[in-house]
A protein has these predicted regions:
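Cell-envelope/extracellular polymer assembly enzymes that use nucleotide-activated donors
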Residues: 4-6
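Short, well-formed alpha-helical segments that are part of the catalytic scaffolds
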Residues: 9-27
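Acidic helix N-cap motif at the loop->helix transition within catalytic regions
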Residues: 19, 40-49, 89-90
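A conserved acidic beta->alpha catalytic loop
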Residues: 24, 35-44, 81
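Conserved donor nucleotide-binding strand/loop of the catalytic core
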Residues: 43-71, 100
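Catalytic-site signature of metal-activated, phosphate-bearing donor transferases
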Residues: 63-70, 76, 80, 87-252, ...
Length: 261
């Protein structure tokens, strides 16, 4: 008998993305949505697909997702972001895993992810296969608190699926800047836990090296203008992350409140 599966989704102001996300996951046995008091129509859209909607203040990606996992009632859990989609082919592969229902096999599965920037699947720049651990047995582990890219920490054997998860990340430059600002703040706060200063070379050489790493070493030049723009953003991300780290430490040393997320 196939085992059951819960889909865990964390949202905040995702009315543009969440319907397509939910459509791709509605075949699962239940959908758990954790919303951080969205100001748009996100919750209204989610109610069309599931009654299992929980609202709580934003406490970081890891804590929000762990909260969703804790409320899942099925044998397996699949973590899905609002800008991601499960294709029919991926659904079939997931259902095959559930149908096997083995107790001594993998307890978690990595799957490749196709990242779409500005409407195009980017195959280079380290964007593919971009393996993500998203499918796991309930109770085998939890996400850590390393923001903004939390890791799932678990005990047991891991397997790999072949079919990719589709990730429609930055659709426009404006989208990229919006996420960029939030993620650089989270990255600076995470770095501040173990580092007490940012040096001048962090703001000069590191961004330059990052650009060449993405554009040349990771062959961003083969992705045309898409690759150039992504490489520039990667360089800017490095600069802003360390600039915010400097600003955060400066504020702490001066007894000021930390910058808001």
């Amino acid at each position: 008998m196939p085992q059951t599966i819960s889909c865990a989704i964390v949202v905040y102001n995702e009315e543009r993305n969440v319907r397509d996300c939910l459509e791709s996951a509605k075949w699962m046995d239940e959908i758990i949505v954790v919303d951080a008091f969205s100001q748009d129509k996100t919750v209204q859209i989610c109610r069309e697909y599931t009654p299992r909607i929980y609202q709580r203040p934003w406490n970081g990606f890891g804590e929000q997702k762990n909260y969703a996992i804790d409320h899942a009632a099925c044998d397996w859990v699949f973590i899905l972001d609002a800008d991601e989609r499960i294709s029919p082919e991926l659904r079939a592969e997931i259902e095959a895993v559930l149908a096997r229902s083995q107790t001594d096999g993998p307890v978690a599965y990595y799957l490749p992810r196709r990242n779409y920037f500005y409407g195009r699947w980017i195959k280079r720049l380290g964007c593919y296969p971009d393996y993500q651990l998203r499918l796991f047995r309930k109770g085998v582990g939890r996400l850590n608190d390393e923001e903004p890219h939390n890791k799932f920490v678990f005990q047991g054997e891991a397997g790999h699926l072949r079919t990719p998860l589709d990730h429609y990340t930055e659709r426009t430059i404006e989208d990229h800047f919006r996420k960029f600002n939030n993620f650089t703040t989270l990255a600076a706060q995470e770095r501040a836990k173990t580092r007490r200063t940012a040096h001048w070379y962090d703001l000069t050489f590191r961004p330059i090296l990052t650009f060449f790493k993405y554009y040349l070493q990771r062959q961003g030049f083969r992705e045309g203008m898409h690759g150039f723009v992504i490489s520039v953003f990667a360089s800017m991300y490095t600069f802003v992350k360390y600039a915010k780290l400097w600003d955060l430490i400066r504020a702490q040393n001066d007894g000021l409140d930390p910058p808001p997320v």
